[in-house]
Each structure stands twice: as C-alpha cells, then as structure tokens.
A protein has these predicted regions:
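A structural motif specific to WD40 beta-propellers
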Residues: 8, 47-49, 89-92, 131, ...
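WD40/WD-repeat beta-propeller blade N-cap
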Residues: 10-15, 52-58, 94-100, 142-149, ...
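Loop/turn segments within WD40 beta-propeller blades
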Residues: 20-26, 62-68, 103-109, 146, ...
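Conserved strand-to-loop turn within each blade of WD40 beta-propeller repeats
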Residues: 32-33, 74-77, 114-118, 163-167, ...
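WD40-repeat beta-propellers
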Residues: 37-41, 80-84, 120-126, 170-175, ...
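Extended acidic/polar alpha-helical scaffold segments
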Residues: 766-876
C-alpha cells in the first residue's frame, strides 16, 4: 500500500479570525481558517485549503490587484507568506516584526503598505524585470500617528494613501515626496477611526469610527486657495499643484457632513466601501449590517445575519455580493443584497469535533462535535450539506449503515438517533430504560441492529432499527465501554473494549450469547476490525497496539507506539522532555481498505500509519504547526518563562478596548475542560480525536483541533514504476500504441506509471479489441487497469467515452471475475469501491438528465395535444 498521503483539504471550519477578501472577478473568496487559508469558488461551488501553514493564526489577507492568485497572509506575530493559489505554491516568506493590523497592495501592484505599530511601512513587491535578492524591499516608513494604525487605503493612481488610527485621526500620506505637500490630518472623531475611503473621483473622503460616526470630507476652497495654501512659489511646487493627479494632496479637506448610524448599545466593528457604486456597508457588534448610499447617506438595506458580532466584511468587484465573517460562531456568509438571498452560508462546529465516519461512496463525511451537532460534508466541494441538531449534548460517535442511506449517532444525552439521508430527517430515536451516557456505537453490516456502549453503568445496549425496541442488554464489562464494532464479514460477532483492561467478543445472534474475554496490559481506548474480519486491533492507555485473532482469541502481537506519538510539549509542562511520552496513547484506530495497514491517532499532534504484517511505522504526519496550540513544539523556549509564569498564559489586555462587554466577561469555571476555548488564557491541545480511512483507500480523514483534515494520495507527484529496462521509454510505448500493439503499449505505460501516458494509450485501444486485451492482461495489472477505468468513468474526469469505459469494465469482470471475487475484501476492495462510486455518480447524472428530458417532452406533448384539441373545436 502507498503511504504518500499529502494534505488535501480542511473541512469543518470555514472562518476563525482576520479579514475575508474577494479575489478575481469577485467569484472567489479567501477566508483565514486558523493558520491556513481557505479558498471558496462561489461559481463552481467548491472550496479548498492551501497546504501551507503560518506559525500562528492568520490575522490579515491581502490580494494583489494585478494577479488575484497572488495572496499575502500575515499571522498574529507579523510573519507573512506570499503564495500562488492557482498553483498552490509558496513563493516567499516575510517577517514584518510586529503584528500587521492591515495590509494593502497598491492598485498598480508595485507596492505593499503594512501597518507597523504607530507607523506605516511601504514595501516594493517582487518584479520580474528587476532582479533583487530579497522578495520584498522596504521603500519608506511613514510616521505621525500617536497610537496603533488600524487601516490603510490607497488612491487610484497609487501616489497617496490614507491611514486610520486608534488616536481618533486619519492621515493622508504621499508615496514619494511631492513638492509643497505636507501630510494632512483629519480630526473630528470621538473614537478610534476604523476605515477611511476615497470616492470614485477622489473629490470626497469618508471616515468611519467605532462609535458609529461617518464623516464626509471634501475640498473647502477653490483652486486659487489651494495654490495659496501650498505657500511655495517654486516652479516645481506650482507644477505639482496644477497636476490633476495631485488633487488629493493640495485640497483643503474639511468636514462637509456628519452622519451617524444610530444603532443603540452597539459599536461598529468593520466596514467596506465600493467606490464605483458609492455604497458603504458596515458591520456591528449586534450581528447586524447596514448598506448605505453615499454621499447622501441613505439606508438601502439592513439585516441581522448573526447572533454575534460581525468580525469582517468585504464587497466583490461588481458590488452585488457582500461577504461576512463572524469570529465567535465560525460563520462565513455571502449575501446578494439586490435579491436578498444567500450565495454562501457555512458554519463549522462551535466546539471541537469528536468523531467522524465515511459513507460508502467515499465522497461524504459525517462529523459530530461537542456542540451536539451532526454535520455532513462533501469531500469534493468541501461544503457542509446538512446539519442535524436534535441532540442536546456532545456527540460521542457516528456511523453509517453499510447498506442504505442511513446515519446513526450516539450522544452523551442518552439517545442514539437514526437519520434518513434521503429526506434528511430523524426517523428513529433509541433510548435505554434508565438514562445513561453513550460513548460508543456499532452498526451491524445489514443495518438492522445497532449497539451503543455506556460510560456510567458499563453496559452495552442493542436495538432493532426497524421497530426501535430494545433487544438485549450486554453486561460484563467493569468499566466504561469505550469502543464497539461488528465483524464486517457478517459473522455476527460484536467486539468491545473497556477501561477494565479487557476485549470481549459477543455472539449476539445466538441463543447461548457466549462471550470471550481477552486481557490487555492497560485500559482499552479503541478497537478496529480488519475488513475481512480475521483480525482485531486494540489501542490501550499504555501506548500499545495489540492484535488478536477473533476466531480463537489468540494474541498475534503487540506494538509499542509511545515514542511514535510523543514529542509535543505543553507550555505548562512540569516534566522533562524524555518523560513526556508517559501519557501518550492512541484513542482512535482504523484499518486501511485492503487491511494491510493501521492508521492511529490520539492525544498528540501526530497521526501514524503502521504496517500490520511487519509491525513497523511507515509514516507519521504532523497535524498542525500552530504555536498557539499545546503540543506543537518539541522544545519550550525558556525566554518565554517569567516570574508570573509562561507569557502565553498571561492575559494580554492591550486590545481590551476593542472587545465588547460580553467578551470581557470571563465565565469559565475553575478546572473546566470544556466550554468556550476562545479565551486567550486557554490553549487547546493539538490532537486527533478520530481517524478514518476512506472506503476507496485513496484518502483518510482526521477530526482534529484544527478541523476535519483530509489527506489524499498525490498521484501526480508519485512515481512508482515496476519492471523497468533500458528499452522501455515513453517514446517506445507511444510507437507501439500507434502501431496497433495495444496490449504491449498498455503494459509499458503501466510499468512506467505515467498517468498522462497511461490515459493516452488506454483511450487509443480499439473498441472491438477490448475483450481480447482484457483476457490477455496479466493478473498483476488487473487492479491497476480497474483503477484507471474507474477514474476515467468518474464524471469529474470529463471523459466523453462512457460506453468505452463500461465496455472495459464489463470485459475485465468477465475475464477475471473469479479472482476479483476471491480477493474482493482485500487487495481489490479499494478499486471496487472506486468503480462503484463512479457508477453511482454516473447513474445519478444520467437519471437527472433523463428526468429533465422526460418532463420537457411531456410539456411539449401536452402543449401540442391542447393545441390540436383547440383546432378541432375551432373547426366544429
């Protein structure tokens, strides 16, 4: 099995903090998700996360106006990354030394303005015509504010820019010295000035402050007074004054109008201005936003879209779509104000997600979190498709039925619920005679029986899905039943593990109800069945993975994994680094689709992949590099330790004036492990609560502190040739294919493992030769050809040769069906699932087209019939 899994996408979280930004023609939205950047394509309805991480959560996002794929992100410490979102490549690193409250590219794309405390720094951006050693070169530093600078706005000609500050003023600077010009100060606000904007003709300036005031500034004098105000009779100064490009520099700006938003008990948090339409949108702490027409200051639209404050707002290029981000609730919204409809409405889990499960098609993932929500995510688009909120407590485990569109969830509220994924409703609720907390769940392969293990009475409950009645109560464990799973082969065996250091096998469908107990060296935390049902893997508290034969209960081996999962340090660790592995353990295990590997994750920042046969570690992935999470650093910095404790645990009150009254109140209880972890005095632990392999074997997912992380095989960068020789080259393969030797060319392309060449040779095979080539194909390459056919059959490949691919599939099954059936649960399982998924999606697409065509033909037929009857009546 290949282990070259790379980061693919991040689901479960759509927005955390910072500013949202539109790119391109306004159909792309950039949103900071922790220390990663998420990209949402609003036209194609897909999203993905960049594979690069900053050191801390992203604070600002800036998009180049000359190339919307060039995006600069900066974290809380001022460390920035310049990346190309189209190629998903990292171009440059940069450190601004201080937190950047705002970053803006100039309209010509040649300069980058960055807030630097009370100063503004302007940097020259990389240029293909000028070779420089550093990617960014400091052009000039601008001073004048007495408090932190909040925002920057450029003029259209990139010669001037406005800056706003906490000192309740805005200032106008010139990029380069202009004869006779001195920086201008705009005063008159009573609170911090959040934003300042130029009008389209740059004859008017608008400033917005936190207290809800909007001031309109314009020129008070004529052109003659502007020249007198310059006070310089030098020829260069006169030419600069008469230059229309310098109008904003020599105008005598004064307050022409004072307007107020009149929102009681609220403050302005963010604002955005669209110059071509002169529309101003403002977000408030109450979750309300309002749209105003400037300079008349007429209210166009007002709507409450969130229960908490709106943290960021952006307007697309056409001015039709408004993007909002709500930090506390993790909401991301795109609103079309003209039609009053949502273009995008996404929200992640409010607290951590505890569990996940893959559907049989591999394209749907369900997650359950501490907020009591069950969410379904599409792995292709990255969007949440439906949310179930019937549970009133944290979700402990979710499972799909192997057959049918049914989803089960177990919760600490004492219920197990079944959901119909066709009608999206909760059609069955299972409860115990006495209220208990369910912490584990298992579904029988036929989907007719569901079992749940409790944490307080140490019993396992079994219900019938059809009737909803309790069938049996399995007693025997002496601790919380932490994990349950049925034999996937359908033998009826139920495996369970508990804190009582045992693994039990229950024959639940036999009258005897015999049980068999196998001893562990420590408390059992998780277990998994191999897909063929011939082996069980159990994770225990001592950091071991134990393997058992479920047929006779014999132990097949023990794997010590404590050193593999340890390594992360917490800021309040009191033990030495060499003793840090004592509490490391896996809390979730899962077999690969072919059963050759085990994926494990737990209370550490790593997910490990082990080879079952050799009992060795194949690969280890680090989930996050976010320094604000505990467990991401291998060594602690002694410079961060003070007499009052670690600096990271001390509340920073420097920005308390920007918080609302509700945010300043600390409602956390001493010793509480759950609750609002957005408080700055708490540090979440980087860990993986649940890991699962995709049924296709091409990807795996982890429910981590950062969200739902998806890792997939990078087929484009993986070169895995077999049986090479000097004569085997791409040119020789193409020559054989053009000469008509299809089998030789296909085998050569398979041995070279070149995906582009393989598709070219495969689709050049003649239709009538497919059955013959399928019969002559060696058994060694059948799985690879099936994988190729499944990938080309998938509608996402945009291949028009549907009948050709179906003919290949039928011929392979006719020629090698017996061997495929024999190995269907092991080596061929991922390929068969991929083919089934492609066929199901193809069938759904064809059915949709046929239904639409049938409805259209019925409409035409009914119209013709009515017209014919009307003609008959007119004749009579």
């Amino acid at each position: 099995m290949k282990s070259s899994f790379e980061f693919s996408n991040l689901c479960g979280t759509v927005y955390q903090q910072g500013n949202v930004q539109f790119g391109g023609n306004g159909d792309t939205l950039y949103s900071p998700v922790g220390n990663r950047l998420a990209v949402f394509d609003l036209v194609r309805n897909v999203s993905f996360a960049m594979p690069f991480e900053t050191r801390k959560p992203i604070m600002r996002v800036a998009v180049s106006p000359k190339n919307s794929h060039l995006v600069l992100v900066a974290d809380e410490d001022g460390h920035a990354l310049l990346m190309n979102t189209a190629r998903r490549s990292l171009l440059a690193h940069m450190s601004f030394k201080l937190p950047a409250r705002d970053i803006q590219f100039s309209p010509d794309g040649r300069f980058l303005a960055v807030t630097h405390g009370t100063q503004v720094q302007v940097w020259r951006t990389p240029n293909v015509f000028v070779r420089e050693f550093a990617p960014f070169v400091l052009h000039r530093t601008y001073v004048g504010h007495s408090d932190d600078v909040i925002s920057i706005t450029w003029s259209k000609n990139s010669r001037f820019f406005l800056s706003t500050s906490k000192d309740m003023t805005a200032r106008l600077f010139s990029l380069d010295p202009v004869p006779g010009f001195r920086p201008k100060t705009f005063t008159g606000h009573r609170d911090a000035v959040l934003q300042a904007y130029f009008s389209l003709d740059e004859r008017t300036i608008y400033t917005v402050s936190r207290d809800g005031a909007c001031l309109t500034w314009s020129n008070k004098d004529s052109q003659e007074l502007m020249q007198e105000e310059s006070g310089d009779t030098d020829l260069g100064a006169t030419e600069a004054t008469n230059d229309p490009e310098n109008y904003v520099a020599f105008a005598r700006w004064g307050v022409m109008q004072r307007n107020y938003f009149h929102q009681a008990n609220t403050q302005v948090v963010c604002a955005a201005f669209h110059a071509p339409t002169s529309r101003l949108v403002v977000g408030f702490t109450s979750g309300l936003f309002s749209l105003w027409d400037m300079p008349d200051f007429q209210s166009i639209h007002a709507l409450s879209i969130s229960q908490d404050k709106i943290s960021s707002v952006a307007i697309n290029e056409s001015g039709e779509w408004l993007a909002f981000g709500a930090q506390r609730l993790g909401q991301l919204l795109v609103w079309e104000w003209a039609s009053e409809s949502y273009i995008l409405k996404q929200q992640g889990h409010f607290f951590d997600m505890n569990t996940l499960a893959y559907a049989q098609d591999g394209q749907t993932v369900v997650t359950g979190g501490d907020d009591g929500k069950v969410k379904l995510w599409n792995t292709v688009s990255g969007f949440c498709t439906v949310t179930f909120s019937e549970h009133s407590a944290a979700i402990s485990q979710v499972e799909f039925a192997k057959q049918g569109q049914v989803l089960f969830s177990a919760s600490l509220d004492g219920t197990v619920r079944a959901y119909d994924l066709v009608r999206y409703r909760n059609f069955r609720t299972f409860t115990s005679p006495n209220p208990v907390q369910f912490v584990s769940l298992a579904v029988e392969p036929s989907g007719e029986v569901v079992c749940a293990g409790s944490a307080d009475v140490f019993e396992t409950y079994m219900w019938s899905v059809q009737t909803g009645k309790l069938l049996d109560i399995l007693a025997g464990h002496e601790g919380p039943v932490t994990s349950l799973q049925f034999d996937p082969a359908g033998s009826g065996l139920l495996a369970s593990t508990s804190w009582d250091r045992t693994v039990r096998l229950w024959e639940v469908f036999k009258r005897s109800g015999a049980t068999e107990a196998m001893q562990l060296n420590a408390e059992g935390l998780a277990l998994a069945y191999r897909p063929d049902g011939h082996e069980i893997c159990v994770a225990s508290l001592d950091g071991h993975l134990s393997f058992f034969d479920p047929q006779n209960g014999a132990s097949r081996g023990v794997l010590d994994c404590r050193r593999d999962i340890s390594g992360g340090r917490s800021v309040n660790d009191k033990v030495a680094r060499r003793n840090n592995a004592a509490g490391a353990a896996f809390t979730s295990v899962c077999y690969s689709a072919d059963g050759s590997c085990v994926l494990a994750g737990g209370n550490a920042n790593y997910v490990c992949l082990y080879d079952v046969r050799e009992r060795v570690l194949l690969k280890r992935w680090k989930l996050s590099k976010n320094l604000l999470l505990d467990g991401t650093q291998d060594r602690l910095d002694s410079r961060q330790v003070t007499d009052a404790g670690n600096v990271a645990l001390i509340n920073d009150l420097s920005d308390e004036d920007e918080l609302t009254l509700a945010e300043r109140q600390d409602r956390s209880l001493p010793g509480a492990q759950r609750g609002d972890l957005s408080k700055r005095s708490t540090r979440p632990l980087a860990r993986a609560k649940c890991v699962r392999f995709s049924p296709t074997g091409q990807s795996w997912a982890a429910a981590s502190t950062s969200g739902l992380l998806l890792y997939a095989l990078d087929t484009g960068s993986t070169f895995d040739p077999t049986d090479l020789d000097m004569e085997l080259t791409p040119q020789s393969v193409r020559s054989a294919s053009l000469a008509g030797d299809a089998l030789l060319a296909l085998l050569g392309a398979l041995r070279l493992s070149d995906p582009i060449l393989l598709v070219e040779v495969y689709e050049r095979v003649k239709y009538q030769e497919v059955p013959l080539i399928a019969r002559q194909l060696p058994q060694l390459y059948v799985a690879e050809v099936l994988k190729l056919v499944a990938s080309r059959l998938d509608p996402s490949s945009e291949s028009p040769h549907v009948e050709f691919h179906l003919h290949w599939l039928s011929s392979l099954f006719n020629a090698h069906g017996e061997k495929i059936r024999e190995l269907g649960h092991s080596s061929y399982a991922p390929v068969l699932r991929a083919a089934q998924m492609a066929l199901n999606e193809l069938r759904a697409n064809i059915k949709t087209v046929c239904d639409e065509n049938t409805a259209a033909m019925l409409y035409v037929y009914n119209g013709l019939t009515a017209r014919h009857e009307q003609q008959i009546q007119d004749t009579l």
